């Protein structure tokens, strides 16, 4: 009985992990780059999407104004031409690199916060008070007791 339960639980966990992995992967990344952020993030709102396949038509899921939104991608014109060209992989945006194929907005937001933390305008760290040697709150030095 115990081995049956073990194998059943193992099989269930394997299938659940595979199913969740496919759901998180989502579809293909859509053509183009997310538009550049204009302004700073003041208050986050609800996200409209989690991946490009959540957005209708050719819109992309981009992190703008503190949340993910479905927006039309920036399209860069070929030099001397009239057609749009997908340059999202070949030429990075100023100050950053394009998102690699298959990456999700969640990894993009994590890298955004890792690079820009603390957010601009928050202020500086508080100075350490003079004479403060230790920040061990609630721990006072006590004499060593000898155990006999």
UniProtKB/Swiss-Prot annotation:
PROSITE patterns named among the record's database cross-references: WAP
Entry-linked Gene3D superfamilies: Elafin-like
Residue ranges that the Swiss-Prot or TrEMBL entry lists as coiled coil: none
Keywords: Antibiotic, Antimicrobial, Disulfide bond, Protease inhibitor, Secreted, Serine protease inhibitor, Signal
InterPro entries per the UniProt record, alphabetical: Elafin-like_sf (IPR036645), WAP_dom (IPR008197)
Gene Ontology biological process: defense response to bacterium
Transmembrane segments: none
Keyword Signal set for record: yes
Positions of the UniProt region annotated as Disordered: 74-148
Signal peptide per UniProt: 1-23
Annotated Gene Ontology cellular component terms: extracellular region
Compartment(s) where it occurs, according to its Swiss-Prot or TrEMBL record: Secreted
Main location: secreted
MF (Gene Ontology): serine-type endopeptidase inhibitor activity
The UniProt record lists the keyword Secreted: yes
Chain's role: Antibacterial protein. Putative acid-stable proteinase inhibitor.
UniProt protein name: WAP four-disulfide core domain protein 12
Native organism: Lemur catta (Ring-tailed lemur)
């Amino acid at each position: 009985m115990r081995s049956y339960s073990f194998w059943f639980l193992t099989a269930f966990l394997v299938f659940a992990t595979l199913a969740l992995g496919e759901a998180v992967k989502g579809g293909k990344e859509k053509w183009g780059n997310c538009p550049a952020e204009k302004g700073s993030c003041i208050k986050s709102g609800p996200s409209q999407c989690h991946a490009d396949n959540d957005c209708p038509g050719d819109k992309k899921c981009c992190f703008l104004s503190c949340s993910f939104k479905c927006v039309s991608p920036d399209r860069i014109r070929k030099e001397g031409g009239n057609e749009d060209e997908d340059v999202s992989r070949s030429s990075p945006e100023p100050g950053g690199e394009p998102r690699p194929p298959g990456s999700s907005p969640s990894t993009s937001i994590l890298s955004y916060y890792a690079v820009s933390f603390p957010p601009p305008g928050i202020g500086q760290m508080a100075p350490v008070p003079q004479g403060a040697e230790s920040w061990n709150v609630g721990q006072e030095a006590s004499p060593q007791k000898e155990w006999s």
